[in-house]
Amino acid sequence: LLHLRGRLKVLLTPNYETAEKFVNKYGNNIVGIISDVRFPRNGTKNPTAGVEFAKWVRSIHPSMPVMLQSTDLENHTMAEAIGADFLHKNSNTLLQDLRDFIISNFGFGDFTFRLENGQKIYKATNIKELIKGIEEVQIESILFHGRSNHFSNWLAARSEFNLASRLRSLDVNQYESGEDVR
């Protein structure tokens, strides 16, 4: 998914090479990747093209949310090894799992401040409440969301592209303390 000209867009690519071109062209505007584990690369079906693509994307954009999907449950191990989420296409909860991933990582819905362990600590439904949350929640939550670009993705989903781009370009590790990030 990426945002251009005021709205988020979904780009569907037929092969590895086209996906790579899209990332090179739109990389700073992409809010996340959902990919099959297996898809065409160099003209033939490649059983690990999605994993290779995810690794390549992460080498350029380390905090990019990535979900790999497959009918083969054993591919979960490869996804886990590269820090990607995994979606089993034969799961009874497929649609709910996909929805949860998109809402949690691409900025749709309310902004839920969480700790790294997933514990929910505050919910913001608008920018005013987001600012209040940033002022009040634990530093650990701010660092977690800052490292993962959750703030910029959430703002981009609300057409706040200038602010989202400015936040995305910041690296929380460049600050002396968590309070400086706040």
Residue ranges and their predicted role:
Residues 2-32, 42:
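Acidic, metal-coordinating helix/loop segments flanking the phosphotransfer/catalytic sites
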Residues 6-15, 43-46, 67-112, 116-119:
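Output/docking surface of receiver
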Residues 20-21, 38-63:
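Short amphipathic alpha-helix used as the core "switch/output" element in two-component signaling
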Residues 29-31, 60-65:
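His-Asp phosphorelay/catalytic-motif detector in bacterial-type signaling
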Residues 110-144, 179-182:
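Membrane-interacting alpha-helical segments
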Residues 141-173:
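Amphipathic alpha-helical packing elements
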Residues 170-182:
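Charge-dense polyanion-binding interfaces
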